[in-house]
Amino acid sequence: MSADQSSGDPLNDAAELPRVSVVIPAYNEESVIRQCLIAAIYQSVPAHEIIVVDNLSTDRTAAIVRQMQLEYPESPILLLSQDRDQGLIPTRNFGLDHATGDVLGRIDADSVVEPDWVEQVQRAFQDHSVQAATGPVVYYDMPMRRFGLKADDKMRQLMLKLAKHQYHFLFGSNMALRSTAWNTIRAETCRDEKDEMHEDIDLSLHLAEHDLKVQYVPQMVSGMSARRLEDSPRDYRYYVTRFDRTYKAHNVKKMALKAPMVVFFSVYFPAKLLRAIHTVNTAQPVRRGGQ
């Protein structure tokens, strides 16, 4: 049954919908974790579980999650601790390994998913050929959010065309994959102990090696912070060139895939200035969507 088809029997359709776990790796995220969890809680269709994996945080991240467990006892918020290794990849892996859903959503601690995010993920995975999915993001702490969402969507669709649909890249702030797909690639994913690569691109390339289909879903929208623009030019350059290092690790030489690097480099200074002006002139709470 495709994502657009229905059996006509509401009970059967509900039974076929996959259970969606939401996994959120977190390190010193006290400033954003509450808004992230509130967005994950208030969904048109509830998540099977919402897992925060605390990775040796030294701030109040874990305390805030525990407080929210008390405030929202009906919500399936789970707090796990990954204190063996510092880093996103071991923390991500720990969360995905412990998730019990049919589909494993993965977002960042600064993500603010749209109210129908879980529902859109379920719809996408009703197509049994889909093994992973990703969607566009809107930068909620930037001006012109509606334009930004459209631009992000267009850029990601352009990437698909440039890659001639050979590679469909996941975006770590807004992605999901089947538990079976994760189990297939789990042992092969790069540990990246030097922290040189984009872990979401690495996941995507391992999925491609097994011919596991990644679907781009424009309706699967998440907000995220543009806080990356706070990086120094040197740190930002290192972040952007992670694309190259990830491609090299997988012996991917398609020149068209360098397009995101060009885009990210070209927007850094104007976007950084725009965000600084916007931050000074506004004190609005986080809003969902391109509003």
State the predicted function of each range.
Residues 104:
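Short aromatic/hydrophobic "clamp" motif used to bind/position activated sugar donors
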Residues 39, 54-63, 84, 111:
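A conserved acidic beta->alpha catalytic loop
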Residues 19-21, 49, 202:
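Cell-envelope/extracellular polymer assembly enzymes that use nucleotide-activated donors
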Residues 8, 29-42:
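Short, well-formed alpha-helical segments that are part of the catalytic scaffolds
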Residues 116-146:
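Conserved donor NDP-sugar-binding/catalytic core segment of glycosyltransferases
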Residues 82-99:
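Glycine-rich, basic loop-to-helix element that forms the pyrophosphate-binding segment
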Residues 135-139, 147-168:
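Short, flexible, basic/aromatic active-site loop/helix in glycosyltransferases
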Residues 193-203:
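Acidic donor-binding loop at a coil-to-helix junction in glycosyltransferase catalytic cores
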